[in-house]
Swiss-Prot record:
This is Replication protein 1a. GO terms for molecular function: ATP binding; helicase activity; hydrolase activity, acting on acid anhydrides; mRNA methyltransferase activity; RNA binding. One of its GO terms (biological process) is mRNA modification. Coiled coil: none annotated. Residues 660-815 form the (+)RNA virus helicase ATP-binding domain. Residues 71-261 form the Alphavirus-like MT domain. ATP binds at G690, V691, A692, G693, C694, G695, K696, T697. Residues 687-951 are annotated as: ATP-dependent helicase. It is found in: Host endoplasmic reticulum membrane. Residues 816-966 form the (+)RNA virus helicase C-terminal domain. It comes from Broad bean mottle virus. Gene3D superfamilies: P-loop containing nucleotide triphosphate hydrolases (3.40.50.300).
Length: 966
């Protein structure tokens, strides 16, 4: 049945005045009127899809809530969300200030924004000033195509060009500039308005902070943006960095942005342009530039600029880096300076050394610019100074007091007649002033004719430079211009391309609608002789076409785009693990560099041993090796690398270097480099997911085939346990070391090819780590043994986000019978899983063959001295701090180092262990989330065969172990 209605036939048959036709006309008229009303109101409605905080929502509504119908949908998280939301509203605000039917030019704006709103009166000048602008055009093209394919509204070509604003020939009376003034400046905007066709009024917005005129850096708190001025003169720039954002920052010439703060008028020919700063809200300034050709008489303009209480501050000059040739301005509260001067002047003693007077000034300055605690309440006295500038401000204020004191004394002295010589000096040399930065006639004449004469004070020629430190900043602020050629060549190309994109997208949309319409048109009642089996048989017997065969064949080129989701997932996991390993190496280098600097290590000497002593008390693995071969502290650990000015790496006996716990096995960089060379394997992954004590190590031993298999473990201790289980006394043999390896060793040094890869405690491995090993050994199957509910892979960098750390398996075999755990542990774990709402856990149905009925107990202790050390027991802790305390306790009672290392571990380290007697020790009642962790508590409760004793000091909220152990 056709989907189209023949109106002419309907009218001829039924009549134009029939009720149905009348309703159709009325409905269509209503729809058109509704559409027109919605279009007229579109400029009054602002849809903001960014997620905003409560404070940001309030600020946005306070700024634009009255002028527009603000709709905050909170759909997605966007970088610098408030700034982006404000920018959308700024477009509406600026455009709404002009006549609704007049042409408007947008200097540097987004043509897609106006096109999506259907506002055809706005022409956008979008020059490509760098890679960012070029890539923005690419992104807009993608979004343009998406809009055209999903809506019938977009049929016209966007109205924009790639010309700079001053080169654009589009005629319009009005212009807008939304955050484009950073690259053009006030005078640049005036030139763009003037040539080639004059535009009457421009309205724009720009980020604004009055402190930019005085400070070198500052913050726009509501926008979460920091700004910093760098460089000097014509090369000075201002940088904007959004706090806690990963997006690109912004760098602009200071002279362009500064012009909006310092300039007010500019004339070109007979046209005068006036800058009017209209409104400052949310650290965004809305301004207007108005052009006039009217002959204007001279006038002194005074502009009220919002410097947010800037008049309450004084500029104090302080030296930079103890260099008397370089000074900077520091803002100090006017009240603080005046009170310091008032009190200090009363304490000023001429017979004192200047340092004594400076101490008095510093003491008073501290009292007037610090936090005072009275009756337990903090009261701010004055305004706090930067701790790095406090002493220099005190120094400058002291010199200022000396200067004022000397001025008064000289003034008093000049009141007395001291002869013609003194009269000559004060009148002709100093122009009647005893102290002046400007000389008199004679002094200026000599300085001009004989410039090499030293007519100023000794400070002008004093060269006193103290170089304290060098700080290098790695910055990438520019890209070679040649890179831009890969984006667009000519303006005609991009305009033609936009038209082509619209035609292509519209054609595809129309074709899709026609195809859907055809499907409905062809849908008719099937004849009686029609049978569904005929269609099935026809499809089955239809030969495969050549096109289909080509699509099924493998690509001939080596560089092919990976479209298989499984391959994409595996490549992502490997790359993530490589990046994670690289991050660990960078963290190690950064920490050691910081330690090296704090210790004051230079050359062959360490200048600040107290820092080393402090760090060593916290971590006894921190040590310093001297060039004479001795260590600062007795050597108790083995280190493979060290750090000094030569970087992190192997060191010689005659070098000075520092070490910490990461230097015992620093292999992260080697692992990262090796992972970059592997690719995603095609082998299958079978997960043997067994409960604690189900005999995973025994299963590995029975499954292992020497000729075909290789075993990989998560850590060195697991590898030693597996070697002992399989090879017995020959666990240190070359063969055992070759076929049973740790994952890190396999990645760094490689391993033989095999048919099957067996993995012990697979849950402790990163998925990318397991895949890298599988690719290196070219196996066809990975048999991973582990427990998906015990402790999994944990990142050692809290800031590194993991996406692929959990192992993805093709098949999972569940083992729910334990041979190790006593019966009361089985019951306790079942309750634990139910309390944690883990209804799908395999532990809900696990059973035990153990004959031990009662094993769990707990006791309260008040100190570590109540922990008895018994050689037949295994001691567990949740934290490294508790473990270190237990190790010290064991050494105090005379237990040897070998026993301590083999019988005291953290719960994380003990995963996979099986012992008869376990003692879990908690020495503090401070917050520890590990005792609330389901996986950590599961591991702790399932290590023993016979007894489990929980020794705890104080009550801890949410302690799952204490809850289930009675």
């Amino acid at each position: 049945m056709s989907s189209f209605v023949n109106l002419e036939s309907l009218i001829s048959e039924r009549g134009a005045n029939c009720r149905g036709a009348d309703e159709i006309v009325n409905n269509e008229t209503t729809r058109i009127l509704t559409s027109q009303i919605e279009h007229s109101q579109r400029s009054k409605k602002v849809n903001i899809r960014n997620k905003l905080s409560v404070a940001e929502c309030d600020a946005f509504r306070a700024r634009y809530g009255g002028a527009f119908d603000v709709n905050l949908t909170h759909e997605y998280t966007a970088p610098h969300s408030l700034a982006g939301a404000l920018r959308v509203a700024e477009h509406y605000d600026c455009i709404d200030s002009f006549p609704p039917e007049d042409k408007i030019i947008d200097f540097g704006g987004s043509w897609l924004h106006h096109y999506s709103r259907g506002d055809s009166r706005v022409h956008s000048c979008c020059p490509i000033l760098g890679p960012r602008d070029a890539t923005r055009h690419e992104e807009r093209m993608c979004r343009l195509r998406k809009m055209v394919q999903t809506s019938d509204r977009f049929v016209d070509v966007p109205d924009f060009c790639l010309n700079k604003a001053e080169d654009c020939n589009v005629q319009a009376d009005w212009a807008i500039c939304i955050h484009g003034g950073y690259d053009m400046g006030f005078q640049g905007l005036c030139k763009a308005m003037h040539a080639p066709l004059e535009r009457g009024i421009l309205q724009g917005t720009i980020m604004f902070d009055g402190a930019m005129l005085f400070d070198r850096q500052g913050e726009l708190p509501l926008l979460q943006c920091r700004w910093q001025r760098v460089g000097t003169g014509s090369k000075e720039q201002i940088k904007f960095d959004f706090i806690n954002e990963s997006t690109l920052s912004y760098v602009h010439d200071w002279k362009n942005l500064g012009s909006f703060l310092t300039e007010s008028t500019y004339s070109i020919g007979g046209t005068t342009y006036l800058l009017e700063r209209m409104l400052l809200k949310c650290s965004i300034m809305t301004y207007k530039i108005i052009a006039t050709n009217v002959r204007c008489p001279p006038e002194s303009l005074r502009h009220c600029i919002w410097f947010e209480n800037i008049s309450q501050y004084l500029a104090v000059q302080i030296p930079i880096g103890y260099n008397l040739n370089d000074w900077k301005t520091v803002r100090v509260a006017r009240a603080t300076v005046r009170e310091v001067e008032e009190i200090s002047f009363r304490c000023f003693k001429e017979n004192k050394d200047w340092t004594e007077n400076m101490r008095s000034v510093a003491s008073i300055l501290s009292a007037k610019s610090s936090t005072v605690i009275i009756n337990g309440q903090s009261i701010m006295s004055g305004e706090r100074l930067d701790v790095l500038e406090y002493h220099l401000v005190a120094f400058s204020l002291t010199l200022n007091l000396y200067q004022k004191y000397e001025k008064l004394r000289n003034f008093q002295g000049e009141l007395e007649w001291k002869g013609w010589a003194n009269h000559f000096k004060t009148r002709l040399w100093w122009c009647g002033r005893t102290v002046s930065t400007e000389g008199g006639f004679l002094r200026n004449f000599l300085a001009d004719k004989i410039p090499w004469l030293k007519l100023n004070t000794y400070a002008d020629s004093l060269d006193f430079i103290t170089k304290i430190s060098e700080v290098e900043s790695f910055e990438v602020d520019s890209v070679p211009t040649s890179r831009l050629r890969s984006f667009f060549q000519k303006e005609e190309n991009i305009v033609e391309r936009a038209a082509s994109e619209i035609m292509s997208a519209n054609a595809r949309r129309i074709a899709k609608k026609a195809e859907m319409s055809k499907e409905f048109d062809d849908f008719v009642d099937a004849p009686e002789e029609f049978a569904p089996e005929d269609v099935v048989e026809e499809v089955i017997n239809t030969p495969v076409t050549q096109d289909v065969k080509l699509r099924q064949s493998k690509p001939e080129t080596a560089r092919s785009i990976v479209l298989d989701p499984d391959a994409v997932l595996k490549n992502g996991a490997i790359n993530e693990f490589a990046d994670y390993s690289k991050r660990l190496h960078e963290n190690t280098v950064s920490n050691l560099r910081h330690l090296w600097t704090l210790m004051g290590c230079r050359g062959n000497e360490i200048h600040n041993k107290s820092v080393a002593e402090t760090y060593h008390r916290v971590d006894d693995m921190v040590n310093v090796h001297f060039p004479n071969g001795h260590w600062m502290y007795p050597l108790k650990y083995e280190y493979t690398v060290g750090y000094n000015d030569g970087g992190l790496g192997e060191k010689f006996e005659n070098e000075l270097y520092v070490v910490d716990k990461t230097c015992s096995c620093a292999n992260a960089k080697a692992i990262a480099d090796a992972c970059k060379k592997v690719s995603a394997p095609t082998c299958s992954v079978v997960m043997v997911d067994g409960v604690a004590g189900c005999g995973k190590t025994t299963a590995i031993k029975e499954t292992f085939r020497f000729e075909k298999d290789i075993i990989v473990t998560a850590n060195r201790k697991s590898a030693e346990d597996v070697r002992k289980a399989i090879f017995g006394d020959a666990s240190d043999s070359e063969v055992a070391l070759k076929v049973v390896r740790t994952a890190d060793s396999a990645i760094m040094h490689g391993l033989p090819e095999c048919h099957r890869l067996l993995v012990d405690e697979a849950g402790l491995l990163h998925y990318g780590q397991l895949l890298a090993v599988a690719d290196l050994c070219k196996c066809s199957e990975v048999l991973a043994f582990g427990d998906t509910e015990q402790i999994s892979f944990k990142s050692r960098d809290a800031t590194f986000r993991m996406k692929y750390c959990n192992i993805e398996y093709d098949k999972r075999d569940i083992v729910s019978k334990t041979f190790r755990c006593p019966q009361d542990v089985v019951s306790a774990v079942k309750i634990l899983k139910r309390k944690c709402a883990n209804r799908s856990s395999k532990y809900n149905g696990w059973v035990s063959s153990s004959k031990v009925e009662k094993s769990l107990s707990k006791s309260r202790i008040v100190s570590i001295n109540q922990v008895s050390m018994e050689k037949h027991k295994f001691y567990l802790t949740m934290t490294e701090a508790d473990k270190a305390a237990l190790c010290s306790r064991a050494k105090d009672v005379g237990l040897d180092k070998t026993w301590v290392e083999s019988n005291m571990e953290t719960v994380h380290e003990a995963q996979g262990k099986a012992v008869d007697h376990v003692v879990l020790v908690r020495l503090k009642s401070t917050k520890c989330d590990l005792f609330k962790s389901e996986e950590y508590c599961l591991v702790a409760l399932t290590r023993h065969k016979r007894t489990f004793e929980y020794l705890y000091n104080g009550d801890l909220g949410g302690d799952l172990i204490s809850f289930y152990v009675t």
